Amino acid sequence: MNKEKVFLEYFNKEKLNSEECFKNYKDRKVIFKKEIDRKIYFIKKYVPYGKREKAIAFGLQRDRAKHYEYISKKLDKIGIQHVHSVYSKIKRYSFFKRASILVTEYGGEELAKYSKNYMEHIELFKKFFDIYIKLAKNGIYCTDYNLGGILINNKGELTLIDLDAYKTKIILTKQYKRKLITLLRKMYTHSNETQEFEEFCKSEIERVIKELNWKI
């Protein structure tokens, strides 16, 4: 089977109504799940709108598929395990209008599935925060770092996904640090986790702040 031909079909709007549509974020980011030759693929389709659309057109921002690959190279350099893309394509309809797709293979189960019995996997959850610290020390920050955005691969290793939510910054203001920590706390404040797990997360986030020496 010609995989590229299959992947390109996901530029078609008709696919939004297909059973393969896994998640849809107001048609701006759509995730499809497709099995090809006994392998599971996730096809992400990005359609920029508004300010992002104009910024990409004028070269002020990277297309999100290209940004994923940009962050992927950064993670390779610092030795952080993540799901690599196997295919990407940008389709331009006009100077402003465009869409892109990025394809990854199935990378494992979400770490979130293990939060109810986290004590049995305590080292993985500590590693989750260790990775956050390592990213920040290398100028890489995530505004949506959560247990659903990291997988456990078939080797039992933590593996990052959703790299389009990661950013690089040279200078970090105190205000932005506060924002990052507030967003990190959402992983337990916006979920139905146990009190014990919530206390564990609070303790680990305090460790994050201390190790990064963030005066917030």
Predicted regions and their residues:
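Surface-exposed, interaction-prone regions with an acidic/low-complexity signature
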Residues: 1-6, 10, 38-51, 60-64, ...
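Residue-level preference for long, well-ordered alpha-helices that form the structural scaffold
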Residues: 61-64, 120-124, 173-177, 197
